[in-house]
Curated annotation (Swiss-Prot):
Source organism: Helicobacter pylori (strain ATCC 700392 / 26695) (Campylobacter pylori)
Superkingdom per UniProt: Bacteria
Pfam name, any one: AA_kinase
A GO BP entry: 'de novo' CTP biosynthetic process
HAMAP family in the cross-refs: PyrH_B
UniProt name for this protein: Uridylate kinase
Length: 240
């Protein structure tokens, strides 16, 4: 008997750094292809998919502003443009394997992509298209995690998935500490007050206020995204 898929609409957040793969900068085509195939498996199972990608593989606003020459506001806008570059790359990868995809930007770039309109985004999803949201919230001082949470709420997602390099949430960095303990479930409050890095406090608070579950999972395990949505144990952690 086939497992029943519980969530019909999800938003998946990928970090820009993940797109760089083993490189320090840019886009690893192999990683891009892997992500595209994982997204395709969701679409083939009648799941409506929204995507947000960070821009850290190109530039981070906070880092750009550290030298004192570039103001933080300008640095953040530069970061927003980086997310649009990643969004267009992901669109190409998805369309290459046959998925109808739209990019919507919080900053108007009409020659490249649509401007973000939540009603239009929902209509695209209902038609089976993948929608990639670029340029963050369109405002400086907000992270792409916050942008992803905001878009997830606006389009009515059942949950937001933060796809990372680890299997879930740990009490400390599993890449540095062999005794790191995986936390399968924790509350919004625990995520806010603890030293556990899930998302920034603004994103978690927004999810809490709107009762949006946050899932953290490993993006590099083949089939893992689909398994997460089926609520199989052992492949993710959840904040709710």
């Amino acid at each position: 008997m086939q497992a029943k898929i519980k969530n019909k609409r999800v938003l998946v957040k990928f970090s820009g750094e993940a797109l760089a793969g083993d490189n320090q900068f840019g886009i690893d085509i192999h990683v891009l292809d892997h992500i595209a195939k994982e997204i395709k498996s969701l679409v083939e199972n009648d799941i409506e998919v929204g995507i947000v990608i960070g821009g850290g593989n190109i530039i981070r606003g906070v880092s750009a502003a550290q030298g004192g020459i570039i103001r933080r506001t300008s640095g953040d806008y530069m970061g927003m443009l980086a997310t649009v570059i990643n969004a267009v790359a992901m669109q190409e990868a998805l369309e290459h394997i046959g998925l109808d995809t739209r990019v919507q930007s919080a900053i108007e770039i009409k020659e490249i992509c649509e401007s973000y309109i939540y009603r239009k985004a929902i209509r695209h999803l209902e038609k089976g298209r993948v929608v990639i949201f670029g340029a963050g919230t369109g405002n400086p001082f907000f992270t792409t995690d916050t942008a992803a949470t905001l878009r997830a709420i606006e389009i009515g997602s059942d949950l937001i998935i933060k796809a990372t390099k680890v299997d879930g949430i740990y009490d400390k960095d599993p890449n540095k500490f062999k005794d790191a303990k995986k936390l399968d479930t924790l509350s919004y409050n625990d995520a806010l007050i603890g030293d556990i890095e899930v998302m920034d406090d603004t994103a978690i608070s927004l999810a809490k206020d709107n009762k949006l579950p946050i899932v953290v999972c490993n993006m590099f395990k083949k089939g893992n995204l689909l398994q997460v949505i089926k609520h199989q144990q052992g492949v993710f952690s959840m904040v709710k």
